[in-house]
Amino acid sequence: MPKYYIITYGCQMNKSDSEKVAGILENLGYTPSEKMEEADIILLNTCSVRERAEEKVFGKLGELRKLKKRNQNLLIGIFGCMAQRMKEELIEKFPHVDFVLGSYKFTELPKILESLDGKKKVVLAEDIPSPQDVDFRVIKRENKFQAWIPIIYGCNNFCTYCIVPYLRGREKSRDPEEIIREVEYLASQGVVEVTLLGQNVDSYGKDLGNVDLADLLVEIHRIPRIKRIRFLTSHPRDVSDKLIRVVATHPKVCPHWHLPLQAGSDRILRRMGRGYTYSEYKALIEKIRAEIPKASFSTDIIVGFPGEEEEDFLATRRALEEIKFDTVNLAIYSKRPGTPAANYEDLIPYETKKRWFDELENLQRKIIYEKNLSRVGKEEIVLAEEVNPKNPRELSGRTENYRLVFFEAEKELIGKFLLVKITEARLWSLKGEVIREVDL
């Protein structure tokens, strides 16, 4: 039987897309290959959010050139956001690539594979990407107890730095009944935790008119075998009081919020087109904490946006000190072709951006370690997810607040909920001891 190998770059939505592609290929008779060198088809699911993500793909394509020389029958395909952005340019730069599929076009994979003859190159990408769903029963999930579930595609916000709306299209919500059918099916297959995905997940239902994310969470909460529900990514401007109340009053909905701040300076937030001020963002955090005291928060911060000055950077630093996020994803600004910010000329020298980045990273290290220290001695319910690759005697899993915990346990407990006593604080994780298995 022919073998496939998929390499995934980027966000959780890309991970979900790769699971769909794996399911499509297995439906065609392919089996997964543990080693890239032994595969008959290699697919790269790509990301264009930052230049560095694209550079990783270029490096991998250079590596695959050598593999193709050794095996002329090897098929190499590229899909995802980078494929949507570059289209034919990828074939021109890397002639050993056989096909390029833009956003959502991986659904055409069966036809593409049938049409390839070893000489013909295929590029399939729409100017305006339009989502196409895959039968959820054929999706090859990464594991048997957790599942990604896209509920809304695209984004309407058009932040000045972001290329995603151009590559993923406008917002399009999935039918709520179809989503519920998918969750019910997954529950019947043993899934206990679902994560609802969207580039802007709390915009769900705006284009449908009669449902929103809060309504959907309530419906999924009614499904008995589902024990945990997560959702991401949220735009701060779209978090409603209704959504906060639903998270507060429905115990299966994890009280973890991913709310990208991007900057603590109102001037830079305006330039980014984020649609809120720092004081409005902070008020939202305070409102959530007042209603959900155990809520945790992660965020994204862009360092060195064009025109950023020292006082803007210091405002962002103060924001991190005031809010004390549980996780901060820091990124140095990366110019993306076709976005309004790509035309801004007041660029920041790399040395300045790196200094600011290092300063924020060091600050966040202190904050997260202090937060982790405060967990020592407490008991947490953890879903055991996988064997620790650095220590086969340990498993790792996450709390409802998305804190990573390592603990000694047999691998047979993977997929189970465990009561774990936290015994040690580490920089990015916690260490614990299993007390017992729990039935939620």
Curated annotation (Swiss-Prot):
Family annotation (InterPro entries): Elp3/MiaA/NifB-like_rSAM, Methylthiotransferase, Methylthiotransferase_CS, Methylthiotransferase_N, Methylthiotransferase_N_sf, MiaB_methiolase, rSAM, rSAM_horseshoe
Residues that coordinate or bind [4Fe-4S] cluster 1: 11, 47, 81
Domain MTTase N-terminal: 2-118
Location within or outside the cell: Cytoplasm
GO cellular component: cytosol
Cofactor note: Binds 2 [4Fe-4S] clusters. One cluster is coordinated with 3 cysteines and an exchangeable S-adenosyl-L-methionine.
Principal subcellular localisation of the protein: cytoplasm
Limits of the Radical SAM core domain: 141-370
UniProt-listed Enzyme Commission number(s): 2.8.4.3
PROSITE patterns from the UniProt entry: MTTASE_N (PS51449), MTTASE_RADICAL (PS01278), RADICAL_SAM (PS51918), TRAM (PS50926)
UniProt key word S-adenosyl-L-methionine: yes
A Pfam family annotated for this UniProt entry: Radical_SAM
Job description of the protein: Catalyzes the methylthiolation of N6-(dimethylallyl)adenosine (i(6)A), leading to the formation of 2-methylthio-N6-(dimethylallyl)adenosine (ms(2)i(6)A) at position 37 in tRNAs that read codons beginning with uridine.
Subunit: Monomer.
Protein name: tRNA-2-methylthio-N(6)-dimethylallyladenosine synthase
Species in which this protein is naturally found: Dictyoglomus thermophilum (strain ATCC 35947 / DSM 3960 / H-6-12)
Taxonomic classification: Bacteria, Pseudomonadati, Dictyoglomota, Dictyoglomia, Dictyoglomales
Gene label: miaB
